[in-house]
Amino acid sequence: QMFPSVDELKAYTGVLRPRNLELFIERVENKLGKENYKKYFDATAALSLLCYKADLEMMRRTSALAGFQMLDLQDFPGQGTAVVGILNALMQSKGIISAEEFRSWNDDVVPLWLADSYTYFAGSELKSSIKISNNSATDLKNATLNWSLNSEKGAILSSGSFRLNAPAGILSEAEVLNIVLPSTDKALACKLNISIAGTCYRNSYSLWIYPDIKALAVLNNDVKLFSQYSEELENYLLAGGKAILMPDKNAYPQQTIGGLFTSDYWNYSMFKSISENAKKPVSPGTMGLLIDAKHPLFDEFPTETHSNWQWWAAVKNSNPLILD
């Protein structure tokens, strides 16, 4: 799921009224502020795309796959409203991704990167492989695949190319990559770009490189760590102190929800009742992170304003607090 687009409301100029979207947007704006809505829309849309890419690539990595059905390319206004589409309910673009970018991981031919992780230590060896999912009607013969590992600013950290053959209708092993990552004392956000020369087929993957630090030095003694909210913490803050509140797992059992990295599926209220009736755990219903990426806290942890794979372990092991 993602937040609905405010721009979609303008498309209803006839007898139809998007009451469902109006109600949802009104609730969010009243709670979070109208001026902040676009930030939440962008963050939830980015996470939804990240999850779609992972799901579709997972299927393409399946040998002898006959095909798949995507649920759904567009939003579904029934069943309580499922804002799950890359397009809105009117089959119009939401402006969250271009057709060209979407095809980079959902075309008749897709280059795939297979690795054990998205996060690595500086100076380590990145062992991975590239496969080609060729569902076109044409064999790729003696084609050239180019790859490059680029920094966030576009600098090439490593690159190479190789020849490949990818018969139509199958998943082909193209090449094993062994990349020695650069030594660095500062965390790097990188992008692995792969493309087949002379074609429109390309793909890219985010990954992160961190200094191999065995022990963390305390750089600022005036930042204290607290495991629960207390009078001591309150007085410390009122006196001008800086603190990080990292509650213990069982500190606030009635004010926490489970850590969920992926966006909520389809419609929360619908599957909440289904889960309760089946006596199954109910999803937290969360929609990912909205991050102040420029905060000094992230000087050594490069991040966008939305969830990405470097957050996986932290989110899965978290106990988010309900603050309102």
Where are these regions (language model features)?
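Beta-sheet entry/capping signal
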Residues: L65-Q69, V223, K242-A243
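Low-complexity, Pro/Ser/Thr- and charge-rich linker/hinge segments at domain boundaries
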Residues: W208-Q228
